[in-house]
Amino acid sequence: MTSETSVNLLDFDAEGLVAYCGSLGEKPFRAKQLQRWIHQYNAGDFDGMTDLAKSLREKLKGRASIVMPEIASDHVSTDGTRKWLIDVGNGNAVETVFIPEETRGTLCVSSQAGCAVNCRFCSTGKQGFSRNLSTAEIIGQLRMAEFALRASLGRAPGPNGKAERVVTNVVMMGMGEPLLNYSAVVPAMRLMLDDNAYGLSRRRVTLSTSGVVPMMDRLGAELPVALAVSLHAPNDALRDELVPLNKKYPLRELMAACQRYLKVAPRDFITFEYCMLDGVNDTEAHARELLAVTRDVPCKFNLIPFNPFPESGLIRSKPEQIKRFAQVLIDAGVVTTVRKTRGDDIDAACGQLAGAVKDRTRLAERTGAAGKIIEVRAV
């Protein structure tokens, strides 16, 4: 029987698992075996780990566990988009969304219950911040989704190669600001990249940040994955209003951080995300200003039609205005995409992953709550 003080092995990346096995008097190769069982074979207990010595299995049964977050709900859209509501305890919940496409499958992962950044156009921020997720709760979203999706396709667990992988891309674009939970997010991403776990390339793991400049630099030094920046405004005055974090890290500092990051990034551009708000940030003049502020950063733009929520006081830009805005950027030679709406019928949105605005992220209030999901593309 597992003790009350057992460690959750999902909290360990490769280095952590080697250290843990060392504390049990085991050699490093045992950690690799254990990691493969957990992350490639979806093992939930130790008895079935047949290539581990029985003595080690007995040690683990007394000291360790493999504990996944509980799934509160699981919905599939008519277009194949799938959304899970994950119970993370104390009445809090986060959402994980899978977006299937012909050549890839993208998983949108949450890093916090709620968010402290409080962007004006994001309903998650309006609910306040509850807590950081643990590494186990973050990597558990990928583990849960990958093996649930494999089961739905009749595929068995196991390291069957990239052709058998269902989740081919991960975007840290769910609830929360990933760089404000750095100590848990980075080990989770290391597992995403580890060949003894999920084996994704750095180009296929994208972290989206609102612009936490010091942590962007740290990420670049320690684990440079693809980077997206939630920009949403072309000048400091407007961005101060839409993204309050800009008051601490204004655009000049943010653009400089992007330039530094590109020196080590797995891609040669930054993706700038831009929520299209009617009459707020969507004129052709704004587009030209946006080109000016980003001129020294190789980039692409991802324009996001706003998903309205109660009390936001904001309206989605009209399609024709989004098109005009995009054309200014395209005419300047910058790759520009407009994010598509996906899975309307299962209610989960970029910027609205918390569902209908409630008090914080209360699970009982949120199961089945309303929202919209829009396509999340790895970049």
Curated annotation (Swiss-Prot):
It catalyses: adenosine(2503) in 23S rRNA + 2 reduced [2Fe-2S]-[ferredoxin] + 2 S-adenosyl-L-methionine = 2-methyladenosine(2503) in 23S rRNA + 5'-deoxyadenosine + L-methionine + 2 oxidized [2Fe-2S]-[ferredoxin] + S-adenosyl-L-homocysteine; adenosine(37) in tRNA + 2 reduced [2Fe-2S]-[ferredoxin] + 2 S-adenosyl-L-methionine = 2-methyladenosine(37) in tRNA + 5'-deoxyadenosine + L-methionine + 2 oxidized [2Fe-2S]-[ferredoxin] + S-adenosyl-L-homocysteine. Specifically methylates position 2 of adenine 2503 in 23S rRNA and position 2 of adenine 37 in tRNAs. m2A2503 modification seems to play a crucial role in the proofreading step occurring at the peptidyl transferase center and thus would serve to optimize ribosomal fidelity. HAMAP family: RNA_methyltr_RlmN. Signal peptide: none annotated. One of its GO terms (cellular component) is cytoplasm. It is an enzyme of class 2 (transferase). [4Fe-4S] cluster binds at C115, C119, C122. NCBIfam families: rRNA_mod_RlmN (TIGR00048). This is Dual-specificity RNA methyltransferase RlmN. Residues 101-345 form the Radical SAM core domain. Its cofactor is [4Fe-4S] cluster. It is found in: Cytoplasm. S-adenosyl-L-methionine binds at G176, E177, S208, S230, L231, H232, N307. The active site is at E95, C350. It comes from Burkholderia cenocepacia (strain ATCC BAA-245 / DSM 16553 / LMG 16656 / NCTC 13227 / J2315 / CF5610). CDD domains: Radical_SAM. It holds the Pfam family Radical_SAM. GO terms for biological process: rRNA base methylation; tRNA methylation. Belongs to the radical SAM superfamily. RlmN family. One of its GO terms (molecular function) is 4 iron, 4 sulfur cluster binding. The keyword Mitochondrion does not apply. Keywords: 4Fe-4S, Cytoplasm, Disulfide bond, Iron, Iron-sulfur, Metal-binding, Methyltransferase, rRNA processing, S-adenosyl-L-methionine, Transferase, tRNA processing. The lineage of its organism: Bacteria, Pseudomonadati, Pseudomonadota, Betaproteobacteria, Burkholderiales. Reaction proceeds by a ping-pong mechanism involving intermediate methylation of a conserved cysteine residue. Binds 1 [4Fe-4S] cluster. The cluster is coordinated with 3 cysteines and an exchangeable S-adenosyl-L-methionine. Its EC number is 2.1.1.192.
